[in-house]
Design a protein with these regions (language model features):
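Conserved small/polar residues in nucleotide/adenosyl-binding loops
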Residues: 193
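Short beta-strand-centered segments that line the small-molecule binding cleft or hinge
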Residues: 113-155
Length: 193
């Protein structure tokens, strides 16, 4: 129904949440992304809406999702532009060295629901997450452990937690946030499924 490029314009716009980033990922200009995304949405009688930095579509998505499945099978079968992304703080270690056919996202998801929705809708092909947020194996997703070693908490020798006399628990770490994000870097509202 749609050629790979036209549907990719819509999907990259939804995935990357920016016409500029979608254009960079597809090696074209923003006007081309916008025009193609709009034509797909109009053809399927869908209403695109950007709310708090994230794109969503309203209307009957059944035909679009079927078309996405076909395009995803094509990407998998022919190794074409397979899309991968990650939760904030995880992706750079794994994704920096990936080469074609992988297309890497910005690894700026702070929630689980949005990337899982992108996986369900065949917009993403793979996503790197962290426990306990990743789903258990089910009919829809396969979880592949990339490391068998636990994460550790590293601090400076002068950190206040080292002054405690009792064994540390995970709750003790909550008073010391580790992410430093610029204002407005991420949407305030996430998609729920």
């Amino acid at each position: 129904m749609f050629d790979v490029f036209r549907l990719s314009c819509l999907d990259y716009l939804i995935w990357l949440r920016s016409g500029k980033d979608a254009a960079l990922g597809l090696n074209c200009n923003q006007a081309t992304v916008s025009r193609n995304a709009k034509s797909v949405a109009e053809f399927l009688d869908l209403d695109p809406c950007k709310l708090e930095g994230e794109w969503s579509l309203s209307g009957d998505l059944s035909l679009l999702n079927a078309e996405r499945k076909v395009h995803q099978l094509y990407r998998w079968a022919y190794g074409k532009s397979m899309r991968i992304d990650a939760v904030y703080g995880v992706g750079s270690d794994y994704l920096n060295e990936l080469r074609q056919p992988w297309v890497c996202g910005p690894s700026n998801f702070l929630n689980v629901s949005y990337p899982l929705a992108l996986l369900r809708e065949s917009i993403l092909d793979a996503w790197l997450g962290c426990y306990p947020d990743v789903p258990v194996d089910d009919d829809e997703f396969v979880v592949i452990n990339l490391t068998r070693y636990p994460s550790v908490f590293l601090v400076d020798q002068q950190h206040p937690l080292l002054q405690r006399k009792v064994e540390l628990k995970l709750d003790d770490l909550q008073d010391f946030p580790v992410l430093s994000l610029p204002d407005g870097a991420f949407p305030k509202i996430c998609l729920l499924y």
